[in-house]
C-alpha cells in the first residue's frame, strides 16, 4: 500500500511541476500586457461564507492595485464541482480563476467516480489564500463533556454527526476521528452548514466538525461545547480548548480547511507569478487581515510550488483515509 501511495504522490507532483514549468517566450509578452480585460474569480458556492468572503476581498484589492475590473462569480452545485470544472475548461489566459477549497482540490477526486475535472491536469496552482481552523462541537445541553467521553460513549451508543455534505471537511474529520479511535459514527449529511449546525444546537445530532468562525458565537453563549481543535496546535481564538490530538490521544490528527486560487492548466507561468506576487502582498494588508480575522482565517500567500506540495500531501492523506475507511458518497 505504501508503494502505491508513493507512486500516486510522485505522479501528482510530476504533473503539478510540469504545469508550473510550461513557460515560453509568449508568457512574458502576456505578462507585459496583463491584465487588459476583466478578471473573473469563480467561487463554486453560493454567496456568503468564507470562500465567498476571501474571493471578494482579493478581487477588490486586485482591482484597486491594477486599476482593472476583477469580479466574483458564484457558481454553486455538485459539492463545488460545477464551478471548478467551468474554470478547468476556460481559456488559459489568466482571466478566469477559481477559488478552490481543499475538498475540490484534494478530496473529491477520490470520492466522485465521474469528476468533471482533474485538479492536477486541468488546473494550475497560484497560491494558498488562507487556512481556517475546525472545531469538534456537541450541543451545549449534551451530557458529553469531553472527547475522551465521546469516544467511550461511541463504543456502546449510536453517535451521530452532521455535515454540510459528503466530502466536506466535517465529513472527513469525523471519519478520521472514527478511524483513529476505532469507533463507529453515523453520518447525517445536510444541504449546507446552517442546517447541519442547527441540529447539533437543538440536540437532534450529537456532534459535528464546524469551522471556527461559525461555531465560536455559539460556544461563547454556551449553546455549543467545544471538545477539540482539529489542528496541530491550539487555537488563539479558543486557547483553553485542547486539540483533538491532546483530548483524544490521537497523534497526527488534523482536519484543517484551506482555500486556494487556481487557474486553468497551461496559463502562462509569468501570469501565474504576477498573480501570486500581488495576492501575497494583498494578504498582508492590515484591512485584508481584519477581514480574514473576522472569518477565522489565517492568511498564507505561498508560492505555486508550495501550494502544489500542499495539494500533493492532502491528496495522498485523504485518499488513503477514503480508501481505508471505505468512505462513499451517500
Regions found by a protein language model. Give the residues of each.
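N-terminal (or domain-start) structured segment
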Residues: 28-121, 157-160, 166, 182-207, ...
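Short, low-complexity disordered leader/linker segments with a strong preference
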Residues: 1-36, 330
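A ligand-binding cleft/hinge motif common to bilobed small-molecule-binding domains
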Residues: 104-114, 176-180, 207-241
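An extracytoplasmic/periplasmic, membrane-proximal ligand-sensing/linker region
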Residues: 30, 36-38, 179-180, 220-221, ...
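Hinge/capping helix and adjacent helix->loop/strand transition within the periplasmic-binding protein
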Residues: 89-95, 102, 110-195, 244-249, ...
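Stable alpha-helical elements in mature extracytoplasmic
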Residues: 50, 54, 58, 83, ...
Amino acid at each position: 500500500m505504501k508503494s502505491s501511495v508513493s507512486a500516486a504522490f510522485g505522479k501528482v507532483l510530476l504533473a503539478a511541476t510540469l504545469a508550473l514549468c510550461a513557460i515560453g517566450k509568449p508568457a512574458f509578452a502576456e505578462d507585459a500586457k496583463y491584465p487588459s480585460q476583466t478578471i473573473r474569480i469563480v467561487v463554486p458556492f453560493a454567496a456568503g461564507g468564507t470562500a465567498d468572503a476571501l474571493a471578494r476581498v482579493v478581487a477588490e484589492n486586485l482591482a484597486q492595485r491594477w486599476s482593472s475590473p476583477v469580479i466574483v462569480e458564484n457558481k454553486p452545485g455538485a459539492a463545488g464541482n460545477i464551478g471548478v470544472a467551468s474554470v478547468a475548461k476556460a481559456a488559459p489566459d489568466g482571466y478566469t480563476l477559481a477559488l478552490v477549497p481543499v475538498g475540490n482540490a484534494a478530496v473529491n477526486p477520490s470520492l466522485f467516480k465521474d469528476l468533471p475535472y482533474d485538479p492536477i491536469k486541468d488546473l494550475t496552482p497560484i497560491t494558498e489564500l488562507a487556512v481556517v481552523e475546525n472545531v469538534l462541537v456537541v450541543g451545549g445541553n449534551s451530557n458529553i463533556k469531553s472527547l475522551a467521553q465521546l469516544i467511550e460513549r461511541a463504543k456502546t451508543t449510536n453517535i451521530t454527526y452532521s455535515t454540510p455534505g459528503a466530502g466536506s471537511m466535517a465529513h472527513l474529520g469525523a471519519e478520521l476521528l472514527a478511524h483513529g479511535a476505532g469507533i463507529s459514527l453515523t453520518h447525517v449529511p445536510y444541504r449546507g452548514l446552517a442546517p447541519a449546525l442547527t441540529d447539533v444546537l437543538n440536540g437532534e445530532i450529537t456532534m459535528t466538525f464546524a469551522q471556527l468562525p461559525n461555531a465560536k458565537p455559539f460556544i461563547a453563549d454556551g449553546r455549543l461545547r467545544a471538545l477539540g481543535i482539529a489542528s496541530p496546535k491550539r487555537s488563539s481564538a479558543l486557547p483553553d480548548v485542547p486539540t483533538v490530538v491532546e483530548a483524544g490521544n490521537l497523534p497526527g490528527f488534523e482536519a484543517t480547511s484551506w482555500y486556494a486560487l487556481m487557474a486553468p492548466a497551461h496559463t502562462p507561468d509569468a501570469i501565474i507569478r504576477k498573480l501570486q506576487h500581488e495576492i501575497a502582498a494583498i494578504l498582508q494588508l492590515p484591512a485584508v487581515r481584519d477581514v480574514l480575522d473576522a472569518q477565522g482565517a489565517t492568511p498564507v500567500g505561498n508560492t505555486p510550488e508550495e501550494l502544489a506540495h500542499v495539494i500533493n500531501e492532502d491528496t495522498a492523506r485523504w485518499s488513503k483515509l477514503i480508501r481505508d475507511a471505505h468512505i462513499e458518497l451517500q
